[in-house]
Amino acid sequence: MKMRTQYIALVLFVCILASCSQESVETIDIIKAENSKEVEQELLNVVNDHRISLGQNALEFSSIAYEYANAHSDYMVAKGTINHDNFSKRASDISSQVDAELVAENVAKDYVTASEAFEGWLNSSSHKNTMEGEFTHTAVSAKKDADGNLYFTQIFFR
C-alpha cells in the first residue's frame, strides 16, 4: 500500500510538473544523432563513483533505459533545446517493461565533457537528488548535434 501511495504521488508530481510547461503539438522530424559512446561510459562511471563514495550502490546499466534515453536525446537534438517533454509517457513505458516502481531522468546540454555535465548536475539540488536517489538501474545517452553540441539524457529506475 505504501509503494502504491508513493507511485501515485510520483505520478501526480509528474503531472503537475508537466502541466507547468506547454508541449508543442508540432511534428518534429527526428534524425538519429550520433552517440558519443566514450562520453556516455565516462558519465556513467563518474555517477557510479560518486554514489559509491557516498556508500550507495553502483547503478546497473539497463538497455531498456538506454533505448528511451537515446530516443529522448534525439528528440532534444531535433528541437534544439533540453527538456523533459513526454517524460510521463517514457516513465510509464519503462515501468511497464521492467516493472519499475520509480523512474527519473536528468538532462543536460552545453557541456563539452562528461565531467562538466556531472558537475552541473551535482550543483543543482534536484539533479543531485536524482543522481543520489534510491535507484538500481540507469543508462546515459550523449548525442551530438550538427554543430557538435552534446545533449545528455540519463534515466534512472528501481
List each model region and its residues.
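Disulfide-stabilized extracellular recognition modules
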Residues: 108-158
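Short, surface-exposed glycine/acidic/tryptophan-bearing loops
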Residues: 70-114
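A short alpha-helix/helix-coil micro-patch that ends at or immediately precedes a cysteine
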Residues: 23-77
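C-terminal motif of bacterial Sec signal peptides marking the signal peptidase cleavage site
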Residues: 15-19
